[in-house]
A protein has these predicted regions:
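Predominantly soluble domains enriched in secretory-pathway, periplasmic, or organellar proteins
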Residues: 16-226
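Sec-dependent N-terminal signal peptides
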Residues: 2-13
C-alpha cells in the first residue's frame, strides 16, 4: 500500500510540472511566452520587441541562457546591421543590446566558455562568406567575428560546449568552430558528398558505410572534415 501511494504522489508531481517556451513572430515583431501544463498550452505574455514602431525589425533567433535567468533575441532586419537583445526571464524586460552583423539569425550559449555564438545569415546580401559573431553576454560586447561560408544558419553548440556548428546554405558547407580558440577547426563539403554518392545503389549496406556516418561519437569522427 505504501508503494502504491508513493507511486501516485510521484505521478501527480510529474504530471503537474510546467514548461515554458519563448516563440518569436518574425513578421509581427513580438515574442510570446507560452506555458505547457498537462495537456494545455496558454500564452502568458506577448512581448513587443524592436525599436522602430513603423518598421518590421524581424525577431529571428531566440535562445535561453543555460542558467535560465536570461533570454536572447536577434533582430535580423537592421540598417544595415542587426542586433542582439538581452532580456530577463523574470520580468521579460530589456537588460542590454549590441550590434552584430548582417541579418543575425540562430544562436546558442556555450556552457564551457559562457560566450554566445550567433550566425550572421546575410539573407539579402551578396553570396560571399559571412561570419559568426562571438558575444560576451555579461557585458553584451561582440568580442570577435569568425568568417565561415555564404549564408550561415542553424547554429548549434556541442553538448560539452567546446564546438559550434553551422551550415552555410549557399556554399554547401558545414563549419566546426573551436569555442576556445575562436577559429574554424574543420569543414565538411556537403555538396560534393551528395554529388559523389552513387544514387544507383540502394542497398542497406551502402547506407551503413556512407561517409560521415561511421560513428555516433559526434561530428569529430566524420570523414571529410578538414
Amino acid at each position: 500500500m505504501v508503494r502504491f501511494i508513493l507511486f501516485l504522489l510521484v505521478s501527480n508531481f510529474v504530471m503537474s510540472q510546467s514548461y515554458y517556451v519563448y516563440v518569436a513572430s518574425e513578421s509581427d515583431d513580438t515574442v510570446s511566452l507560452l506555458k505547457f501544463q498537462n495537456n494545455e498550452i496558454n500564452e502568458l505574455e506577448r512581448i513587443t520587441v524592436g525599436t522602430y514602431p513603423t518598421e518590421i525589425e524581424g525577431p529571428h533567433g531566440i535562445t535561453v541562457d543555460p542558467n535560465g535567468k536570461f533570454w536572447y533575441l536577434s533582430l535580423a532586419h537592421g540598417n544595415p546591421f542587426g542586433k542582439l537583445v538581452k532580456y530577463s526571464t523574470e520580468s521579460n524586460e530589456i537588460l542590454g543590446e549590441t550590434t552584430l552583423g548582417l541579418f543575425p539569425a540562430s544562436m546558442q550559449v556555450s556552457t564551457t566558455t559562457g560566450f554566445l555564438y550567433c550566425v550572421n545569415f546575410n539573407l539579402h546580401g551578396s553570396m560571399k562568406p559571412s561570419t559568426v559573431s562571438v558575444v560576451d553576454p555579461v557585458t553584451m560586447t561582440e568580442i570577435t567575428t569568425i568568417t565561415t561560408g555564404s549564408m550561415p544558419h542553424g547554429s548549434r553548440i556541442s553538448t560539452d560546449g567546446l564546438f559550434q556548428y553551422s551550415v552555410a546554405m549557399m556554399s554547401g558547407e558545414l563549419f566546426e568552430v573551436d569555442a576556445l580558440s575562436l577559429e574554424v577547426s574543420r569543414t565538411l563539403d556537403l555538396e560534393n558528398k551528395i554529388i559523389k554518392k552513387d544514387v544507383t545503389k540502394h542497398s542497406m549496406d551502402g547506407m551503413k558505410s556512407m561517409d560521415g556516418m561511421k560513428s555516433m561519437d559526434g561530428m569529430k569522427s566524420m570523414d571529410g572534415m578538414k
